Amino acid sequence: MANERSKLAFKKTFPVFKRFLQSKDLALVVFVIAILAIIIVPLPPFVLDFLLTISIALSVLIILIGLYIDKPTDFSAFPTLLLIVTLYRLALNVATTRMILTQGYKGPSAVSDIITAFGEFSVSGNYVIGAIIFSILVLVNLLVVTNGSTRVTEVRARFALDAMPGKQMAIDADLNSGLIDDKEAKKRRAALSQEADFYGAMDGASKFVKGDAIASIIITLINIIGGFLVGVFQRDMSLSFSASTFTILTIGDGLVGQIPALIIATATGIVATRTTQNEEEDFASKLITQLTNKSKTLVIVGAILLLFATIPGLPTFSLAFVGTLFLFIAWLISREGKDGLLTKLENYLSQKFGLDLSEKPHSSKIKPHTPTTRAKTQEELKREEEQAIDEVLKIEFLELALGYQLISLADMKQGGDLLERIRGIRKKIASDYGFLMPQIRIRDNLQLPPTHYEIKLKGIVIGEGMVMPDKFLAMNTGFVNKEIEGIPTKEPAFGMDALWIETKNKEEAIIQGYTIIDPSTVIATHTSELVKKYAEDFITKDEVKSLLERLAKDYPTIVEESKKIPTGAIRSVLQALLHEKIPIKDMLTILETITDIAPLVQNDVNILTEQVRARLSRVITNAFKSEDGRLKFLTFSTDSEQFLLNKLRENGTSKSLLLNVGELQKLIEVVSEEAMKVLQKGIAPVILIVEPNLRKALSNQMEQARIDVIVLSHAELDPNSNFEALGTIHINF
């Protein structure tokens, strides 16, 4: 009957226990409540031993996690965990103090076995030695480890916050150039925010460690003095026996608490001083590699130890053995070849003693086939010559030529990521503009200067630049606190002033507010901007066919109707849109407008384009919005706009402005001046809104004058969007 009741009780309680283990939040809450209970409730010795063991285990676990993480933010819970563990250890100090003062007179076994072991075994029962060891541990923890960890976390927190604007702009630059997508940008921004929050929290959490070390000293003094008074005045113990008993117990308690505290403080320093590691090499491997990287240093250490071994009075054997070991390791490292240290040792033992220690694969009895060579026939030689000529005559649609020092940027085996960034450009262009740019042919060109590159469209150079593959480009975007040294240059995509800086100065440049760009990104960004500039050239008839085929999968009827319209007319409309930076992503609206209007206007491209633009009002408005979601624009005064309307002249279906030299000069000067004022406010691009009849003619005039202004008409604005008028342009013609 009793067994059945036990089984029934177990059956009822086990699901509750299982849910408790599975609920991480509940387990943490119970742990914190248990810490508070430890402070209030007296504990028996075996429970106290159990809790002290957990304290030691937690400290070892934390320092091991700190050694194995790749970067500090992988242990983002560390600051909070540090607070909880510190509170737990202080609660144990209260519990052990209560136990020592109330039960210490009965003997060490009545308090705690762990405290007794540390008080008697670790210091041989000598409370003077124990006090000295405890003092050393406290001083090392407080003055060395804790102070260093606190200072490091303060500096890392300040540097992380100072570098945030530069890193944020670098993310925005990668996003704008198509190197990353929105998802990756959000991921990087979240990581950046997490890093700043982590170091900010670490700055405060490090103070817990320092306070814990100070509290340990005070608690130890209280235990010794309080225990002595309790033993003499309340328990009638002799002065010497009371001092010996309570001092040993207190020193044991101090060591049990101070060793985990020292480990936690060391873990804090390790986490705070860790940098991001190479994914292919962990911290321990990298540490050993760097320590044994130069055989010369090991030789010097070995020679110094051997020299010390010859000095009378010093331990000859120990010094000579360690010195010889250093020389042997240095000799192994200095041997030729790229094998690791263990492989070199294995090869040495194999050669020295005739041992075969390597793991060799089973040899095959089948001999490899050796191909025979023969003379090529005349037909084969002729065919190869024709193929070579065809290769020379072939014109690549889009080509990137690199100087020989830049080839490594496109070689993935050498760590180059230019190909990956070019692929990112294609995705970004397709996402933003609605067409798929052709593959970029990347080739080396020995005729170029070593660090130069050229971007060609149909064999014609449309852009060129220079990058230094072993340096970084630092750009001052207006947030620089202090200028740094570097080689002055011009950023090729936008013509901004920049500096080429050494790799070792990268972190300093970020801290000072520079936007840092690697060489591959410089080339990729330049390529991206040129593709946007010449976007209309990529709309071939084949590309139009591909766009229609993709649209036909979802909207076959409209594509079937569009077959009545000449492909050339559709292509011309798409090119006209891209020429003025209007995306063609909404092919459905574009094609519907063309099929509706084309029969009425005899496929006139100018009229079709303006009608399509009016239908794309939401797309156009969204394309030129500022970051705050507003379309910010300039307008002409009523009399200025009316004057320009009166100057319109029709040439068939197109219109142009018929202005004399003076009128044209005034128009260009005033618009340029107003556009510059807008750009100086950090607003780009500059939008100018005019009457629909005036838009195309004025846009052509601005393009001829090379004024970077987007001219829109009132008909192309989405009425549901937010707008902000920046000013009115008045021209005294």
Swiss-Prot record:
Membrane recorded as keyword: yes
Assigned keywords, A-Z: Bacterial flagellum biogenesis, Bacterial flagellum protein export, Cell membrane, Membrane, Protein transport, Transmembrane, Transmembrane helix, Transport
Transmembrane domains' residue ranges: 28-48, 49-69, 125-145, 213-233, 246-266, 291-311, 313-333
InterPro entries: FHIPEP_1, FHIPEP_3, FHIPEP_4, FHIPEP_CS, FlhA, T3SS_FHIPEP
Signal peptide interval: none
One GO CC term, this protein: plasma membrane
Cellular localisation: Cell membrane
Function: Involved in the export of flagellum proteins.
Name the UniProt record assigns to this protein: Flagellar biosynthesis protein FlhA
